[in-house]
C-alpha cells in the first residue's frame, strides 16, 4: 500500500492508483469531464488539475493521469488550482456554448460567463476524445476518430465520410460528457438513421 497526503489528510491506496482514483476513494471531489473509469484516461480537459507540493516547490498535475507515490502532498483547492480551473471553465464555455452539461458544472464551481470570444453558439463538442477511446477500447472498433488538427480539430468518421464500421451501439452517445454525440451520430453512419440503444457502461 502507498501512503500520501491529500489536503493534509493521510490516505492509503493500492500501487498503480492515480491521484483522482485515490481522491474518489476517500470522497474528495475533483471535477472532470473527459474521465471515465471504463477507458484509459488522457487528461485532455485539464479540469482535474491539482497542486503537488514539496516544501517551497510545487507544480500542477492532471490528477486523472498522475500516479500516486509514497509521501507526496496533493492539494485540490489551492488558489492556484482554483485560478487554473476558472480559466479552463471559461475556455470550455467559449468553445462549447451549446453544452448544458458544461454550463452546469461550471456554475457549480462559480463560473457563469467567459471572457473569450464565442465562435459557434451551438457547438457542444470539446474534442476530448472520450468517445473515440470508448469506440476503440470498449466496442473494439474505430468508427470515429479525431479529424483535422489545431483549431479545426473535430470528431467524426475517418476522412469525414459516412462509415459502415459504426454499429449504432450508442456507446459514444452514452459516454460523451457534453452531449455533443447526440447530434453527430447520424453523420457517422453510412446507413439511414437508427434508434440507438445506449450501451450500459
Model-based region annotation:
Residues 1-3:
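Extreme N-terminal starter segment of soluble prokaryotic enzymes
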Amino acid at each position: 500500500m502507498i501512503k500520501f497526503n491529500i489536503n493534509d489528510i493521510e490516505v492509503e491506496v493500492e500501487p498503480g492508483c492515480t491521484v483522482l482514483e485515490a481522491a474518489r476513494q476517500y470522497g474528495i471531489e475533483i471535477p472532470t469531464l473527459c474521465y471515465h473509469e471504463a477507458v484509459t484516461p488522457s487528461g485532455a480537459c485539464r479540469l482535474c488539475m491539482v497542486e503537488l507540493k514539496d516544501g517551497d516547490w510545487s507544480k500542477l498535475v492532471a490528477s486523472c493521469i498522475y500516479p500516486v507515490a509514497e509521501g507526496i502532498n496533493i492539494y485540490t483547492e489551492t488558489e492556484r488550482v482554483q485560478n487554473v480551473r476558472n480559466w479552463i471553465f471559461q475556455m470550455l464555455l467559449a468553445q462549447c456554448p451549446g453544452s448544458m452539461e458544461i454550463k452546469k458544472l461550471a456554475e457549480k464551481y462559480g463560473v457563469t460567463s467567459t471572457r473569450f470570444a464565442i465562435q459557434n453558439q451551438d457547438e457542444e463538442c470539446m474534442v476530448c476524445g472520450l468517445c473515440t477511446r470508448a469506440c476503440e477500447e470498449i466496442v473494439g472498433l474505430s468508427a470515429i476518430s479525431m479529424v483535422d488538427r489545431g483549431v479545426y480539430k473535430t470528431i467524426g468518421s475517418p476522412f469525414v465520410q459516412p462509415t459502415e464500421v459504426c454499429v449504432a451501439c450508442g456507446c459514444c452517445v452514452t459516454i460523451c460528457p457534453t452531449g455533443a454525440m447526440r447530434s453527430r451520430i447520424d453523420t457517422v453512419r453510412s446507413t439511414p438513421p437508427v434508434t440507438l440503444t445506449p450501451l450500459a457502461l
